[in-house]
Swiss-Prot record:
Disulfide bonds: none
Enzyme Commission number: 2.8.1.-
Described function: Catalyzes the ATP-dependent 2-thiolation of cytidine in position 32 of tRNA, to form 2-thiocytidine (s(2)C32). The sulfur atoms are provided by the cysteine/cysteine desulfurase (IscS) system.
Protein name: tRNA-cytidine(32) 2-sulfurtransferase
Signal peptide region: none
Pfam families named among the record's database cross-references: ATP_bind_3 (PF01171)
Cofactor note: Binds 1 [4Fe-4S] cluster per subunit. The cluster is chelated by three Cys residues, the fourth Fe has a free coordination site that may bind a sulfur atom transferred from the persulfide of IscS.
Chain ranges for the short sequence motif PP-loop motif as given in the UniProt record: 40-45
Chief localisation class: cytoplasm
Family designation: Belongs to the TtcA family.
Any further remark recorded for this protein: The thiolation reaction likely consists of two steps: a first activation step by ATP to form an adenylated intermediate of the target base of tRNA, and a second nucleophilic substitution step of the sulfur (S) atom supplied by the hydrosulfide attached to the Fe-S cluster.
GO cellular component labels: cytoplasm
NCBIfam families: PRK10696.1
């Protein structure tokens, strides 16, 4: 890729700035970290690797990057694409081979959504591999839109106010997941991916299925944004401004102990003298 135009340069700077803010806000990367960057072959993970490699050059701290892709043995998966790309970049990488495709096809009936099971199997394998190579952080390519969509998916279908945190300690306690693109917009990532001409690998197992719940939510949010620009930005800010006393979760707030504060100043108003 040659010299960037003014708009292309602004796009690159915006992505790097927003990712840098997220990394700083949540203390995602520290001195001496070994960051395992999970690559799927999609636009998000390519952009993530690109941004983190830039940070590695300019950040005031030292950290290592290891790129990891999981070959799930999907039919037609172009095994040569990622190794060739990563060799050209000169970044350390590993290809983890595990046939989760057969497991998913065996357990999920034809026509049903495979994404959830596929994701769980992939996550477990990557957690194990991160532990094996001594990675201190596992970087995923989820962005701002993913986080908002996940919030609504959990609310609509799981009855929970839960999204994707920018930083998370896994249930096993041995892995810390970071999402440096948490503040970045999907449209910017798509534009940057097109600009950089990343060798995109489509997901033939789940990405082509129609009527997935996530796509329904995505379409809903796009429609909201068209009708009321700025609504999704407000939703994202709300995820950073939680007020437990204004909800109804007794595990987060002890409503049972609420009493009148006898020491509080009186709010009596003398109506006669007004």
């Amino acid at each position: 890729m040659g010299t960037l135009s003014v708009n292309q340069n602004k796009l690159q700077k915006r992505l790097r700035r927003l990712a840098g803010e997220a990394v700083a806000d949540f203390n995602m990367i520290e001195e001496g970290d070994k960051v395992m960057v999970c690559l799927s072959g999609g636009k998000d993970s390519y952009t993530l690797l690109d941004v983190l490699m830039h940070f590695q050059k300019v950040a005031p701290i030292r950290f290592d990057i290891v790129a990891v892709n999981m070959d799930q043995k999907q039919p037609g998966f172009p095994e040569h694409v990622l190794p060739a790309y990563l060799k050209e970049l000169g970044v350390e990488y590993h290809i983890v081979e595990k046939d989760t495709h057969s497991v998913v096809k065996e357990l999920i009936p034809e026509g049903k959504t495979t994404c959830s099971l596929c994701s769980r199997l992939r996550r477990g394998t990557l957690y194990t591999f991160a532990d094996q190579i001594g990675a201190t952080k596992m970087a995923l390519g989820h962005h701002r839109d993913d986080i908002i969509e996940t919030f609504f998916l959990n609310m609509f279908f799981n009855g929970a106010l839960k999204a994707m945190p920018p930083k998370l300690r896994a249930d096993d306690g041995r892995n810390v997941v970071i999402r440096p693109l948490a503040y970045c917009h999907e449209k910017d990532i798509q534009a940057y991916s097109d600009l950089k001409q990343f060798p995109i690998i489509p997901c033939n197992l789940c990405g082509s299925q129609e009527n997935l719940q996530r796509q329904v939510v995505k379409d809903m949010l796009l429609d909201w944004e068209r009708k009321t620009p700025g609504r999704t930005e407000s939703i994202f800010r709300a995820l950073q401004n939680v007020q437990p006393s204004q909800l109804a979760d007794r595990k987060l707030f002890d409503f049972s102990q609420l009493r009148i504060d006898e020491t509080a100043a009186s709010r009596f108003v003398n109506v006669v003298n007004i």
